[in-house]
């Protein structure tokens, strides 16, 4: 359950989409995609955006390409030895203690084979744009009368014209070979060879306005993607096909997770969060949350989930119990969070990365 948990920094999405890589590169004559990560004196205090568990190790990523590692449950941190980019990293996923991937601004995809100690660049926005263009051109060739194929081809041409300026916002690998990434403007790519090559899957999504895709999760043959304007895309055949499902909220959905009992939980703007027990066919609102955007959902063993918001508040939702605000030390606005094996919380944001004790067993409040 805990091996590959990761979060992405939805609190920073507005910034992510307004301060894309050209802005980051303006401060230096060397592009951020080619400049190594900032070496920080206290790297764990840099703006951190996402984290994952890699076996017993914790790996967190953040702005300027900073990656930090902890081998004592988040009590102490050290910086990764080599990261080839200084662009902001937004999400990270591990499949076991050695193999992991991170994504970020400029469409960058990084890979580690040594538990996060060193990283290599597998792709960037230009490589992904070329892959999208190839896929769209092939679809247009096969279906010359398809309006959708023609639209996809035009969108792919725009990606190439714009260059590597689109952020990736989430990544999930299910094993050493198979992974998916999503991002702004309907970016959706898949790999079957551990990230060596990527194929666009955007034409499988009903997203004609190219709205942003914020988060992706999968379990078995089911894949879920949430995004801007209440988007929810679901696949029941391992990602071969997707259908757009209606959701009760038409604002942005920033996060989702799959609870151990099979429930799907989605959350987003203004404290809106919903739970489904039937794979997204119907939804029940998680009531009593303040009108502050949820930025992270983290599921745990008994069907419960933790929800974190922009105010630095953490809530517990369990089936059959009322939503409960957990008593935690004052936190900075959260960019992401990860529930640890000992049921402590790893909180990430403008204050860096901190370990927060929780008392989940004392937080039950029957409805």
Describe each PLM feature range.
Residues 14-17, 142:
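Compositionally biased, low-complexity segments
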Residues 21-23:
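N-terminal signal peptide c-region/cleavage motif recognized by signal peptidases
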Residues 25-367:
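Residue-level hotspots at or immediately adjacent to binding/recognition sites across diverse folds
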């Amino acid at each position: 359950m805990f091996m590959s948990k990761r979060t992405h920094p939805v609190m920073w999405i507005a910034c992510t989409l307004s301060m894309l890589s050209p802005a980051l590169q303006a401060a230096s004559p060397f592009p951020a995609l080619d400049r190594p990560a900032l070496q920080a004196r206290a790297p764990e205090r840099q703006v951190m955006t996402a984290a994952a568990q890699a076996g017993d190790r914790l790996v967190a990523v953040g702005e300027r390409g900073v990656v930090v590692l902890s081998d004592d449950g988040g009590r102490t941190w050290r910086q990764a030895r080599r990261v080839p980019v200084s662009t902001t990293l937004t999400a990270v996923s591990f499949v076991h203690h050695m193999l992991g991937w991170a994504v970020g601004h400029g469409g960058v995809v990084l890979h580690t084979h040594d538990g996060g100690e060193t990283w290599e660049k597998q792709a960037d926005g230009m490589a992904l744009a070329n892959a999208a263009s190839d896929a769209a051109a092939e679809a247009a060739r096969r279906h010359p009368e398809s309006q959708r194929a023609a639209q996809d081809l035009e969108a792919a041409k725009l990606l190439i014209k714009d260059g590597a300026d689109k952020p990736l916002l989430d990544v999930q690998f299910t094993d050493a070979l198979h992974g998916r990434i999503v991002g702004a403007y309907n970016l959706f790519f898949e790999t079957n060879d551990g990230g060596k090559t990527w194929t666009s899957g955007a034409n499988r999504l009903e997203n004609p306005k190219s709205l942003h895709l914020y988060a992706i999760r999968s379990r078995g043959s089911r894949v879920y993607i949430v995004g801007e304007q209440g988007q929810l895309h679901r696949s029941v055949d391992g990602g071969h096909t997707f259908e757009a499902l209606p959701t009760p909220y038409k604002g942005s959905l920033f996060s989702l997770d799959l609870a151990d009992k099979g429930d799907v939980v989605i959350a987003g703007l203004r404290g809106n969060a919903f739970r489904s027990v039937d794979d997204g066919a119907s939804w029940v609102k998680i009531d009593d949350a303040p009108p502050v955007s949820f930025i992270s959902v983290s599921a745990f063993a008994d069907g419960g989930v933790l929800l974190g918001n922009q105010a630095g508040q953490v809530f517990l939702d369990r089936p059959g119990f009322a939503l409960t605000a957990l008593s935690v030390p004052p936190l900075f606005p959260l960019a992401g969070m990860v529930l640890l094996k000992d049921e402590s919380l790893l909180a990430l944001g403008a204050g860096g990365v901190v370990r927060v004790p929780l008392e989940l067993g004392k937080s039950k409040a029957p409805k």
